[in-house]
Amino acid sequence: MANCAVLDWQGKEAGKASLNLKVAKDSSAVDLMHRAVLRQQAHSRQGTASTLTRAEVRGGGRKPYKQKGTGRARQGSIRTPLRPGGGIIFGPKPRQYNLSMNRKERRLALRTALMARFNDVIAVKDFGSKLKVPKTKEIQDFLARLDISSNSKVLIILSQPSDIIRRSVRNLEKVKLIAAEHLNVFDLLNANSLIIGEDALGKIKEVYGDD
């Protein structure tokens, strides 16, 4: 079980929160999280790079000049890979980079990553409830009250982020806002600071606590 402080919007302590999730064994935890990150990054690749082979590149099949008597190296086609504008040898073609991972392993990797970072978590009660209009300065001031550097990568996890909060954080380059249902291993491990809404913490317990 791991514990963290619950703070209000002013940065004052408003209670305690705890989380107890099943995690991977120490001997396999790093490998499991590593495979989960590789899978996530592989799935984000488009795989649309494509080049033309000598059979596909535009141009005639006529021999550019005679075989002998020119003093030059022999050439059989203007589409040969040896000439500028010719085909590409072993160039990339559209492909899928997706990696497979069992659902049970994916969930275990996510729980392991979350528990590993839980000591760095700051739970916030009623996050952004006082924001009536989108205001980036309010978010910046809030992070400053938590002693979070402007250069730190911050992950904010809420159960259902409102449009006001989304618009308030979208201009902050180092701040990423996600819904609790979109929680993932890469974002958890990549962030320097983790902020979780108190209601999002309940959602995480509900979704990931029964395995």
From Swiss-Prot:
Gene3D superfamilies: 3.40.1370.10. GO terms for biological process: translation. Keywords: Ribonucleoprotein, Ribosomal protein, RNA-binding, rRNA-binding. Residues 60-71 have a biased composition (Basic residues). GO terms for cellular component: ribonucleoprotein complex; ribosome. Residues 41-85 are annotated as: Disordered. One of the primary rRNA binding proteins, this protein initially binds near the 5'-end of the 23S rRNA. It is important during the early stages of 50S assembly. It makes multiple contacts with different domains of the 23S rRNA in the assembled 50S subunit and ribosome. Part of the 50S ribosomal subunit. Belongs to the universal ribosomal protein uL4 family. This is Large ribosomal subunit protein uL4. The lineage of its organism: Bacteria, Bacillati, Cyanobacteriota, Cyanophyceae, Synechococcales.
